[in-house]
Regions:
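Polybasic, proline/glycine-rich intrinsically disordered low-complexity segments
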Residues: 13, 20, 29, 85-141
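Canonical SH2 domain fold
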Residues: 65-66, 72-80, 85-93, 98
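Short, well-ordered helical secondary-structure segments
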Residues: 41, 45, 63, 98-100
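Generic secondary-structure microfeatures
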Residues: 41, 58, 80-82
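A contiguous binding-surface segment within folded domains or other stable secondary-structure elements
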Residues: 36-56
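Short linear interaction motifs
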Residues: 50-70
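Short, surface-exposed beta-edge/turn micro-motifs
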Residues: 32-35, 71-75
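N-terminal "first-domain core" detector
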Residues: 1-43
Length: 141
């Protein structure tokens, strides 16, 4: 398995409080160099984005989070390190899957920010196949 996929599936810190989320996003804005910005609705990038593009996108993501995630808590941002992040997963508020987090095919984060070149996580973990029926689900047919 690749180091990117290993990192993607590794341990992350869930950012629960809005205050912590804002601090993380500000930290990213203040350290905008050498980031790969992967919007999983598009192809995985092969180059890092400029600092200007990175900051612009973080601000857009911040707007989406604050306008569309009307909760008292954040809970949809994950990072490998709060102080010196090198990998951040951000889920779109309108694509959270099952709220209990135990679905067979958990949702893919929409935005993946990393210091290492990304791989196509949609190809690797992509959308689930169509369900075949009640019995098939339990028998894994």
């Amino acid at each position: 398995m690749s180091s990117y996929i290993d990192k993607f599936q590794g341990r992350f810190i869930g950012v629960m409080q809005w205050e912590d989320c804002n601090a993380l996003l500000e930290n990213l804005i203040n350290n905008p160099d050498d980031w790969y910005l992967y919007d999983t609705l598009t192809q995985a990038p092969t180059t890092t984005v400029t600092a200007e593009v990175f900051v612009e996108n973080i601000n857009k993501i911040k707007t989406v989070l604050t306008e569309e995630h009307q909760e008292r808590y954040c809970g949809i941002v994950y990072t490998d390190d709060l102080k010196t992040p090198s990998f951040v997963k951000i889920f779109h508020p309108n694509n959270l899957g099952k709220t209990c987090g135990s679905s067979e095919h958990p949702p893919i984060p929409q935005w993946l920010l990393s210091k290492i070149p990304p791989e196509d996580v949609i190809e690797k973990f992509g959308p689930p196949e169509e369900e075949k029926g009640f019995v098939s689900k339990f028998l894994k047919l």
